[in-house]
């Protein structure tokens, strides 16, 4: 007679647990969604000043007690100076495109991505105060903001290199960079509404998107890991 083999009662629960884990939402998709939102936020921080500066430098009308009142522009900047302010971001942005890849490799793409967007968001929140202090300080601030936000694309590549399987890498990369035009499309009209109807006028555009960037940064720190 052969000895009857008893079923392993622990096998079924283990298999069931493994199946449930496989059926869950893959963590790499969470990373991709956060990267999409991060790049959308980067473009929001980058382009909101394009709309806000028109309200900063042009006279505007408001209605008070049934009367239309014309308020003078807060800043008397020439068109050339406005162009310098708008372009100053890119002076810093281009500097970190290649070194950003090394920083991502050296310190980890997830850490550098999160830290850089956090600092860029803080700088956006400070923009109204710095602009009212000195135009030179504003130009320096925008250059530094470009430096920090310039590392995001190299970090995006590094993060997907670790998280995305080869069969999905191209598709997941396309999803993340789609955040760039989406961020621009949302930011442009919303900045116009904020500069007109916001509680602090043009400054509201910087407070709004800077705050969004900080919220994104805290969520990133909580749920995203290096690998």
Predicted regions and their residues:
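Helix-to-loop junctions at the C-terminal end of transmembrane segments
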Residues: 95-109, 195
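C-terminal ends and interior cores of transmembrane alpha-helices
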Residues: 118-132
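Helix-loop junctions at membrane interfaces in 12-TM secondary transporters
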Residues: 129-141
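Glycine-rich segments within core transmembrane alpha-helices of 12-TM secondary carriers
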Residues: 168-199, 204, 210-213
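Residue-level signature of mid-helix packing/kink "hotspots" within the transmembrane helices
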Residues: 47, 89-98, 150, 184-185
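Cytoplasmic helix-loop-helix junction between adjacent transmembrane helices
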Residues: 139-180
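Cytosolic juxtamembrane N-terminal segment immediately preceding the first transmembrane helix
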Residues: 2-58, 62-76
């Amino acid at each position: 007679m052969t000895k009857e083999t008893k079923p392993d009662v622990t096998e079924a629960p283990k298999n069931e647990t493994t199946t449930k884990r496989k059926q869950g939402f893959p963590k790499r998709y969470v990373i991709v969604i956060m990267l999409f939102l991060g790049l959308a936020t980067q473009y929001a921080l980058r382009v909101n000043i394009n709309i806000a500066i028109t309200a900063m430098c042009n006279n505007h009308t408001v209605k008070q007690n049934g009367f239309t009142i014309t308020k003078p522009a807060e800043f008397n900047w020439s068109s050339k100076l406005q162009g310098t302010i708008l372009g100053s971001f890119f002076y810093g942005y281009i500097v970190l495109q290649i070194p950003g890849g090394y920083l991502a490799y050296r310190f980890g793409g997830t850490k550098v991505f999160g830290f850089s967007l956090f600092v860029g968001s803080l700088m956006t929140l400070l923009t109204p105060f710095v602009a009212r202090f000195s135009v030179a300080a504003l130009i320096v601030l925008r250059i530094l903001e470009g430096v920090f936000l310039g590392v995001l694309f190299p970090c995006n590549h590094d993060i997907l290199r670790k998280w995305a399987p080869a069969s999905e890498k191209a598709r997941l990369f396309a999803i993340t960079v789609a955040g760039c035009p989406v961020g621009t499309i949302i930011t442009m009209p919303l900045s116009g509404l904020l500069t007109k109807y916001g509680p602090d006028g043009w400054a509201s555009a910087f407070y709004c998107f800077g705050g969004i960037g900080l919220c994104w940064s805290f969520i990133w720190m909580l749920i995203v890991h290096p690998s």
